[in-house]
Swiss-Prot record:
GO cellular component, one term: cytosolic small ribosomal subunit
SUPFAM superfamilies: Ribosomal protein S18 (SSF46911)
Family as reported in the entry's similarity comment: Belongs to the bacterial ribosomal protein bS18 family.
Alphabetical list of InterPro entries matching this protein: Ribosomal_bS18, Ribosomal_bS18_CS, Ribosomal_bS18_sf
Biased segments, Polar residues type: 1-10
Quaternary structure note: Part of the 30S ribosomal subunit. Forms a tight heterodimer with protein bS6.
Protein name (record): Small ribosomal subunit protein bS18
Keyword annotations: Ribonucleoprotein, Ribosomal protein, RNA-binding, rRNA-binding
Chain segments carrying region Disordered: 1-21
Function: Binds as a heterodimer with protein bS6 to the central domain of the 16S rRNA, where it helps stabilize the platform of the 30S subunit.
Biological process per Gene Ontology, one example term: translation
Domain of life: Bacteria
Example of a GO MF term: small ribosomal subunit rRNA binding
Species this protein is from: Bartonella tribocorum (strain CIP 105476 / IBS 506)
Length: 82
């Protein structure tokens, strides 16, 4: 009985909602030539990191994916990292 009282008195874990790093006045522009920026959103294996991990909005995630794919096509980024 006391165990349930202790659980109810504790505040549940509340995760703060992340904001998109590309929204805002001082946010960087997504550009296929900006390799340093694009590499932050690529995993160690060379895959594009999903937006649920990076907190990028859906619209900006599409722009980011297209910029990464364009940079790969032009040879600025590798397709696979060994």
């Amino acid at each position: 009985m006391t165990d349930t009282n202790q659980n109810s008195s504790r505040r549940p874990f509340h995760r703060r909602r992340k904001t998109c790093p590309f929204s805002g006045a001082t946010a960087p522009k997504i550009d296929y030539k900006d390799i340093k920026l694009l590499q932050r959103y690529i995993s160690e294996r060379g895959k594009i990191v999903p937006s649920r991990i990076t907190a990028v909005s859906q619209k900006k995630q599409r722009e980011l994916a297209n910029a990464i794919k364009r940079a790969r096509f032009l040879g600025l980024l590798p397709y696979v990292i060994k």
